[in-house]
Amino acid sequence: MEATLITPFNSYRTHVGFGAAGQVLAISENTVFKGPILLDNPAPSQREIMEDAMKSIENEKTMHRMLQRHAHPNIIHSILVLPEGIFLERLGMSLAERLTPTALPVDPGLEVRWIQQLVSAVEWLEGLGIAHGDLRPSNILLDNSQNLKIIDFDCAVKFGGELIAGGAPFSKMNDGFKSPPAGVETEVFAIGSCVYNIHFGHEPWSELNEVDGHEVAKKWCRHEYLPPGGDEIGVIIQRCWDGEFKSIRALDTVVKTLRSDGMVARRPSWLQAWFLLVDCRYFLAKDGLSMNKSLGARLRFLGWWGTHRCLSVAVKVERGFMIW
């Protein structure tokens, strides 16, 4: 029999994304679910992929449990961590999608805002002793206010650990295509490449990479970096690639001197977070996955009540229209 993809829910959910380890399903307009890629009737080689996927998602679940206690406005909000996977807030397009050649030009103030938010989030992880390990525009999403949020923590490791993900231009490589241990050096290098992508709208060596990707990889191993220009942001990129910053906090201090558009990202309010949680619990109750029958009944009632009155009123509260 042919292998088929398994989803963890009884009701069918629309897939909104796939990664090396995970599948992402739309739960509602505001929430998504990320779980491991699992197959029914897998081939022997696919079993190994499934085992790696489950390990990666377990690692990500560990990271999100920690981030629930140490939240940051520019790191994706995890709503609920379960044995099956992780419920997360649903965001918009990725930074990679926003920076495609056909997209609208990025305002300089917004560009600086993204740079500052990216560095702030990674500096926060530094304080927790964690390296994201796979910083790249495709692992960064934008909310409705164009604020940046880092996602995908399945490759995150403690400082000093071995990097799981790799590859130029977002992973620093030395001779033999080997990356140094995870830490300030690797994270700052990845930030430099992300900032280059934000500033110029494409990856470093992008045109040459399409012709000879192996030659480009060798250039990165030899530390032959494409000159990023002499403006303020270009200087920061070069310093990131050259490893001049001894901490991400030091880099954060420098990027804060740049002039952004002044917009500030905020974590979900307690009311927003509560309704995101209700959204997930209500879905689980409808899907028959709630382990507490009385809780499930209450959530079904809450969902019905919310559909008819509570949620609409609460949205008005959140928008400042009324209090109840």
Predicted regions and their residues:
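C-lobe/activation-segment region of protein kinase-like
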Residues: 147-149, 154-246, 250
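ATP-binding glycine-rich loop module of kinase domains
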Residues: 3-69
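Conserved alphaE helix
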Residues: 109-124
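Terminal C-lobe "cap" of eukaryotic-type protein kinase domains
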Residues: 242-266
